[in-house]
Amino acid sequence: MTTVAMQQASAKMSTSAVAVGWVLRLIAAVILLQTLFFKFTGAPESVYIFTRLSEFISHLAAPIFGTNFAAMVARSEAFSRVGSGVMELVAAALLIWPRLPWAGAILAFAATAGAIASHLTFLGIEVQGDHGLLFGLANTVVACSIGVLCIYRAQLPFVGRHFQ
């Protein structure tokens, strides 16, 4: 979509849609940015979560790819923790950038949908006594991402022209 087409799509949005869009974008971005400190510094809760993730994937991969691959995956906690943080940093930046909120919403949705799936499978809703806070924050980001995608649907590549 060209810059002119994006501006025309944005110009057609009501003031309230623009305001709600910004609120949803900022909520999701703040939540994503807040978690980066814990991921990048190797906070014990983050290390615990990504160690469990690595063990879970290793357990699933062993029958398919063999024990050597599974052992390598089991040791990938730091890589997956920092990689997840980088993905969330990019998502937050794209959410805030006025030209690409839809891209940030897609990336934020993907990252946090994975977190929700982890909570619902092997982590549990409550992780190390957090009373479900991380699970709730992930659900909030997913809800905000869906809202952003609905509001900025006209800017989506390939399909956006059908919403104008």
Where are these regions (language model features)?
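Membrane-interface extramembranous regions
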Residues: 2-164
